[in-house]
Amino acid sequence: METKIKLYGTERCHKTQYYKSFFENKNLSYVFLDVEEDEINAIELRNLYENKKLNFPTITISGKKLRNPSEKDLNKWINKLL
């Protein structure tokens, strides 16, 4: 079964670290995809955007793409899609 929550980012990005903590504090299963350490993750992230840029942090929840969402928006989509 495919992971429902994916977090694209880097270890050195403070916003990425915020989302990692957010998911862990809510006991949500997610996969972290480091776009600096793994070129496949970078390509996957680029393919989510028309401009093909590394727009991180990006979160996908059951296929819904969220670019640097607010906590309110993130909670809304988690409740709606999970």
Where do the model's predicted regions map?
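Alpha-helical elements of the RecA-like P-loop NTPase motor core of helicases
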Residues: 17, 21, 43, 75-76
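Glycine-/small-residue-rich active-site loops that bind phosphorylated ligands and cofactors
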Residues: 14, 37, 66
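Local sequence-structure signature of Cys/Sec-based thiol-disulfide redox active-site neighborhoods
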Residues: 1-29
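Non-catalytic, surface beta->alpha helical segment in thiol-disulfide oxidoreductase systems
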Residues: 61-82
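Short alpha-helical
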Residues: 14, 40, 73
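Thioredoxin-like thiol-disulfide oxidoreductase module
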Residues: 35-54
